[in-house]
């Protein structure tokens, strides 16, 4: 989980809107809206071998496609990137399928990029969902 956390900047945001086409995380409830401090807490909890939400640990498979550069955000090479995904989670003899789209605000960091913000748009974000304890 640390490697995933290290993809984010020190001011990075991770957002799952609760409504389709939700424009602002401050106007209505979100499924997840984490700043860097909350991301660090999430990763620390997920790394704990006794975390109740992940006993037994989920097995997951991720498929990411249709990756596109949607916009160039600065002369320094910062990017807005979009993609579609499917994530299968299997845990306690139960299988769940999540699907949707992601948008990433990426900023130049050395020879690569870091995630300034990540927005995960679940197709069924406005339906009843059991707790989400895996990272996308």
What are these regions (language model features)?
Residues 68-136:
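A beta-strand edge to alpha-helix "cap/lid" segment located at domain peripheries
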Residues 10-81:
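A solvent-exposed, acidic/Ser-Thr-rich amphipathic alpha-helical stretch
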Residues 1-7:
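Short acidic-aromatic low-complexity motifs
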Residues 4, 39, 106:
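Hydrophobic pocket/interface hotspot
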